[in-house]
UniProtKB/Swiss-Prot annotation:
This is Ferredoxin-3. Keywords: 3Fe-4S, 4Fe-4S, Electron transport, Iron, Iron-sulfur, Metal-binding, Repeat, Transport. Its cofactor is [3Fe-4S] cluster; [4Fe-4S] cluster. Residues 2-31, 32-61 form the 4Fe-4S ferredoxin-type domain. Pfam families: Fer4_10. Coiled coil: none annotated. One of its GO terms (molecular function) is 4 iron, 4 sulfur cluster binding. Ferredoxins are iron-sulfur proteins that transfer electrons in a wide variety of metabolic reactions. [4Fe-4S] cluster binds at residues 21, 41, 44, 47. [3Fe-4S] cluster binds at residues 11, 17, 51. SUPFAM superfamilies: 4Fe-4S ferredoxins. Binds 1 [3Fe-4S] cluster. The keyword 4Fe-4S applies.
Length: 61
């Protein structure tokens, strides 16, 4: 599995991670990304690549 860390101070809620994730891990809540389906994460790191704020980290656990 994978552990997703979201730096809410950096996150601007642009939703890029929501759009790019192939397994719908993220949704926006109160203008911030939340990893609601972390168990589905494939570890592809597409979200990390598209996040202009560098707010996401994905680590294998």
């Amino acid at each position: 599995g994978y552990k997703i860390t979201i730096d809410t101070d950096k996150c601007t809620g642009d939703g890029e991670c929501v759009d790019v994730c192939p397994v719908e891990v993220y949704e926006l809540q109160d203008g911030k990304a939340v990893a609601v389906n972390e168990d589905e994460c494939l570890g592809c790191e597409s979200c990390v690549e598209v996040c202009e704020q560098d707010a996401l980290t994905v680590e294998e656990n």
